[in-house]
Every structure is written in C-alpha cells, then in structure tokens.
Amino acid sequence: MGKIIGIDLGTTNSCVSIMENGNVKVIENAEGGRTTPSIIAYTNDGETLVGQSAKRQAVTNPQNTLYAVKRLIGRRFEEDVVQKDIKMVPYTIVKADNGDAWVEVKGQKMAPPQISAEVLKKMKKTAEDYLGEPVTEAVITVPAYFNDSQRQATKDAGRIAGLDVKRIINEPTAAALAYGMDKAKGDHTVIVYDLGGGTFDVSVIEIAEVDGEHQFEVLATNGDTFLGGEDFDIRLIDYLVDEFKKETGMNLKGDPLAMQRLKEAAEKAKIELSSSQQTDVNLPYITADASGPKHLNVKISRAKLESLVEDLVERTIEPCRIALKDAGIDVSKINDVILVGGQTRMPLVQQKVAEFFGKEARKDVNPDEAVAMGAAIQGAVLAGDVKDVLLLDVSPLTLGIETLGGVMTPLIEKNTTIPTKKSQVFSTADDNQSAVTIHVLQGERKQAAQNKSLGRFDLAEIPPAPRGMPQIEVTFDIDANGILHVSAKDKATGKQQSIVIKANSGLSEEEIEQMVRDAEANAEEDRKFEELATARNQGDQLVHATRKMLTEAGDKASDDDKAAIEKALSELELAIKGDDKAAIEAKIAAVSQASTPVAQKMYAEQAQAGEGQPAGEQAKPGDDVVDAEFEEVKDNK
C-alpha cells in the first residue's frame, strides 16, 4: 500500500507532509518552498498555473487569477459572505444553476472544488516527486467550523484531483496532533487558536494517556469561517486607497491592475510590520490621468495597522470564550496555547491571546506547517504505521430537522464526539398524511429558516392514520469525516428512505465524474507538454554544443562535414519551434549522426595528445598523494 499523505488545503497557502521512519516531514515543492500559494491562474495561451508561478503573474492577469477560493467552497451565491467577497476580488463570482457560488474564467463557469483540485494536484505531484511513486490517498484538513456542505465539497475536490480522501480532519485537531505527539506522557489541556488566511477556529483539546494510548479528545470547538488574514489585507488596502484618493482625488477601486498591485503591497507591508515598527508602501506609476502618471507612497506604522484591524482581532476572542464555556473548563486550567495560521505572527494577535488566556503562546509550533504535519500523522494512524494514537473529534454545529411551526428540533448537539449516531421518533401533523418531508438543518438557531439547510427528502406511502399515530424514526449518523448520513423509517411498515447529505446544492455525482475525467485529460495534456518541453531543451542544448564543437574543430572538419552538420542544425532549430515531439527527436538523431565523424576525429586527436604528455607532469598528482599521506602519518603520531 502506498503512503497516505497529509494536506493542509489553506485559503492563502497549502502544505503537504508525509510520515517517514517515525518522523513527520514537510515536503518542499518544485520551487523549493515548504508552502505553496493557493493561487490558480489561467493564461491567455491556455496554460493553468498553480502556486508561485500563478502569484507572480497576478498583477498582469488579475481577472483570471483565482485566490482565496476556499472561502467560496460549499457556499450559496446568496449568502452575505459571498456577496461581500464579490466586492473584494478582481475575478468574477457567479451563481451556478444549483444556486451555489462558482467563479467564471474566460466565459467558463467553474465550481470551487474544481479549482481547489488544481492546488491538491500540485500537492499530490510534490509528494510523488519526493517519494518517487504514485500517491493516491490523502488526509485533508478543513477548518473545524466548516459545515457539512463545505466538508463534502472539500472531499469532492480531492476526488477531482485523483485522490482517495481517507479522512477529513479539523485543522486545530491536526495542529494538536503535531504538537502533542512528542510531548511527555501525562494529561494536559491545550487551546489551539487557528487564524489562517480566510478562516478562524479555536478548539479546546485534552491530550491524555489512556491504557498506553496517546488520546487527543476535542472537548469543544468554535470559530468563524469568514475571518482571516485576507480581511486584514483588505483593511490595509482600503486605507491605502483612501489615502491615495485624498492626495490625488482618484479612486483606484475601479482599476483591477492597480488593486492587484495594492493587494501584493499590502500583504508585504503587513508581514513587515510584524517585525518592524514602520514600513513604506511605494508603488510608482500606479495609475495616470491627463496630467501624467501618479505614484503611491504611504508610510504605515505598526500602530496604524493595529488600529485598522483591532476589531477583527477582538472578533476572535468571543469564540474562545464560547469554546471554553462549551468545554466546561476554566481558563486557568489551560496548560498550553498553540497558535496556528500565518496571521498569528502579528504581535497584536499574540498580545490579545496572551491577555485572554493569561499565558504566552508556545513558540515551538510552526504556524504554517503544523496542520499538514498533523494530517500526515493521522494518515499514518489510518495506514497502521502509528499504533498508539486515538483521535476523538467533534461535530462543530448542532444538527436537527424542521418540525411543526418552523422549529428546528436538534438530534445531535454541537461538540458531540464523532463518529456518532442518534435516533428520534417523530409523527405526522395531519390526519391521513401519506408522506413526510425530512428537512435536515445545521446551526444553533431555534427558528429553522435561520439555520443552514443541508438537504431534504421524502418518506412516502405512509398508511392512512390519525395525526400523531404513525411512528417515523429519524436517524442521524455522522461518520469520522464529520459528514452526515440521514435515514427515516416508518416503524409500522418498515419502509425506509435514506440519503447521504450532499447539501441542497453541491456537485452531483455526474458533475464530479466529469470533472475527474477533465482532470485526467488535462494530466495527459500536461504530461505531453512536459515531454515536448524536455525534447525542445535537449534540442537547444545539442544545437549549442554542436556549434561550439564546430568552432573548436576549425580546419579539422571538412567542408562537406560542416555543410551536413549546418543543414541538420537548421532543420532541428525549425523543429524546435513546432509542437511535434517525434519530429524534434528525429532531428536530434540526425544532428548526432551528422556530427559523429567530426567528434570522433577530435576525440582521437585529443587521445594522441594525451599520450604524448611529458612524464614529469604526470608524476605531479602522485607527489601530492605522497604529501597527503605523509601529513596524515604525522597527525596520527
């Protein structure tokens, strides 16, 4: 069986890890980075770029460069957070036929799982290049506060990328695994505060020794799936736009290229202000008007940035309070605070967390890599390579059904340890009612309409009976991925109806299979393109080497030889400009054949010259060896 890799599919950056010989290793990508930007770009010549290469060209191609797509995964177009996102990003967010939020690139509508799959494919390839073997299985992390639709959509993204997702686990839980694996035996309670690029989670986790097993039990979790580093960037961008407007009277918000440059500059400034007190944002030629080009130059202090984002940091404290309350634990009982996510490097975040929990956060956990490392550990547990770890996670939100009067009746309360199964008996609301609709909901509100609708299905052919008489048993079953299976059974007839919740939207099986086929076709195209590029490079190198050889050969090459070689080289150069790999390879062979007589002649002459070398010169290396041996003997005395 192949390795199960661990992937942190992040809003801003992604990371892949593997467990080898009992140690967890973060795998570097082809560019040498330990994390990969979760950015996908579609270029004008039909190429799909992922990661650093996509980020580099974003300024010149903002409408077709997609970032922070994780914030759209499993979401409806009408949701407030999506409407807010539409105003913030340069690419186009559209309403899919099923009501989901999709993106449109070059006139083509694409589902967020399809785009996230491109990042997962890059992670998969990174692992395969390192391991030297195909990778088909993965553990993928999601924010703890992701709802059912978002978890399902993440699993779909894995399938489209050609991965069998063995488990979806929560990011804070994964970070706790990475932190707790090498800690001394004994019980302790930790807080994982995870403020990433697009989402915020906090989990209270108890790490205990139970019968020799390392047990990680999530006691409670809370969060906000639309709060993260991207929001901090937006505050800074808005400030820079306002400052520029005050100075020049020009609004940069209508200029996608200027806004993309601002986004990059704001992100860079934010990072710099974590280690310095002041920085300059200097963007020459940001725009122009009739009077000429305009430049943006704004000084920003750390204090100014903190004043812009203070309320965002404050927003993270309330979920911490709720999580502690739900866990039934006093803040004084917390042994360690672990910070995860790049945004936690901000001094203000660290200060507020320390104030609330009454202790400094640990500095020995890498906020960018801990989540992927935890996923790799979970992968090793599932593969049977790690035996003494037990992970007990929870369902982050209450699950229930809509009952008479538009009320949500809970079946599984939030923070219930998963996997879990709960049943409850309901009945009909009217006499002789022949069918009931089971409307599945997720959320904490009493009114059904205020919660997230996960799906609905009908149980039909109920025998006629007075209202309240039929007994309909509804069963909720949450698997270890946090994905819900619901069934309804008429106890009188034994008739049963069940569904795996796929949300009332989501991707259909046909759509996923089509996307898998498209991805496989693209992979074949990518392979062909790579082979063509390799052949072109070989051809270029041969042209250069052969021309160099001809120059060195001088009169040693006859005019006929030179003419034959030049003809073959011209034909190879022409083939390199084309797209036919076989033609390039044929012309490479022709150049090699044409240049062989000259190369052999030169080799023979070099060999003769070598034989005629004076003996004294050949003795020198021997002298050196004797000296070295002599010194070594002296050292050993």
Curated annotation (Swiss-Prot):
The keyword tRNA-binding does not apply. The keyword Nucleotide-binding applies. Keywords: ATP-binding, Chaperone, Nucleotide-binding, Phosphoprotein, Stress response. Induction: By stress conditions e.g. heat shock. GO terms for molecular function: ATP binding; ATP-dependent protein folding chaperone; unfolded protein binding. InterPro entries: ATPase_NBD, Chaperone_DnaK, Heat_shock_70_CS, HSP70_C_sf, HSP70_peptide-bd_sf, Hsp_70_fam. The modification Phosphothreonine is found at T199. Residues 605-625 are annotated as: Disordered. Residues 605-619 have a biased composition (Low complexity). It comes from the Bacteria. Belongs to the heat shock protein 70 family. Acts as a chaperone. NCBIfam families: PRK00290.1, PRK05183.1, prok_dnaK. This is Chaperone protein DnaK. The lineage of its organism: Bacteria, Pseudomonadati, Pseudomonadota, Gammaproteobacteria, Pseudomonadales.
